[in-house]
Amino acid sequence: MDDPIRVGLAGGWKHIDASTLARSQTVDTDVLIVGTGAGGGVTADLLSAAGLRVVLVEEGPLRSSTDFKMRESDAYPELYQESAARKTADKAINILQGRCVGGSTTV
């Protein structure tokens, strides 16, 4: 199976890693979607298929399956909010929330 991230980038996805920008940029778009999880990704696909210019914003990095580290101690800090240490306010429940393009659906 082809890597969907590499296929998308080769097919014309525009990817900007804002952490590498020297200064702010202005982006002209019809729709801005914050969060690239299941809901954001599907919505972006539908809106772009309808001819709208869509920008997705995500806190974490764009990772391909070839970028994933298989050791949990290496992977968690890169893929989860707060290195997978996020908890409810009373600290009773751990919250595994993805911090990468695709959000929790990726991890």
Regions found by a protein language model. Give the residues of each.
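N-terminal redox-cofactor-binding region of secreted/periplasmic oxidoreductases
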Residues: 1-107
